[in-house]
């Protein structure tokens, strides 16, 4: 169950609305940020499980591993297949955004993944880094502008706070 204590930064009515998944069907995004252990991955996966229960196609990727695989895909010819798989999902969950530096090719690949989804699929991006720092993290101003335009103009932001939920008794 979701913990709705005052220090968590979660609004029960907003979560209930998000769990109806209208935003997924509309191809909108959710950006989930917060410190380590605040439940970003758990919340993102709750939306993913709910979407799967509604018969929607869901894909989950840790950003650094996805980009590593795509970099290999440039060399072994699997890049198009990887991008097509991600583009076909109704909901793509990109977890641990901002944990490792983006390479120039990683920035471009991330932009392509997000661009493939505009108007056709919803994306959740979860990470510790506040959204206000994403532009600087991406580094390349043109790519950063393009990525931010694709994810934030039609997105809901959830900022989780409070102490770590790991090891907390239920």
Range-by-range predicted roles:
Residues 1-12:
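Charged, amphipathic alpha-helical linker segments immediately N-terminal to NTP-binding catalytic cores
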């Amino acid at each position: 169950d979701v913990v709705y204590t005052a220090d968590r930064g979660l609004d029960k009515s907003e979560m209930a609305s998000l769990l109806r998944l209208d935003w997924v069907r509309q191809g909108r995004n959710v950006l989930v940020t917060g410190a380590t252990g605040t439940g970003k991955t758990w919340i993102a996966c709750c939306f993913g499980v709910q979407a799967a229960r509604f018969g929607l196609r869901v894909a989950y990727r840790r950003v650094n591993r996805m980009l590593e695989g795509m970099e290999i895909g440039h060399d072994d010819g699997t890049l198009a297949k990887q991008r097509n798989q991600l583009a076909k999902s109704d909901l793509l969950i990109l977890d641990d955004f901002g944990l490792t530096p983006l390479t120039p090719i990683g920035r471009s690949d991330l932009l392509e993944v997000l661009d493939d989804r505009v108007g056709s699929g919803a994306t959740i991006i979860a990470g510790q880094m506040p959204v206000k720092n994403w532009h600087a993290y991406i580094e390349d101003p043109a790519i950063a502008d393009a990525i931010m335009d694709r994810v934030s103009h039609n997105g809901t932001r959830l900022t989780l706070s409070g102490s770590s939920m790991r090891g907390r008794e239920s």
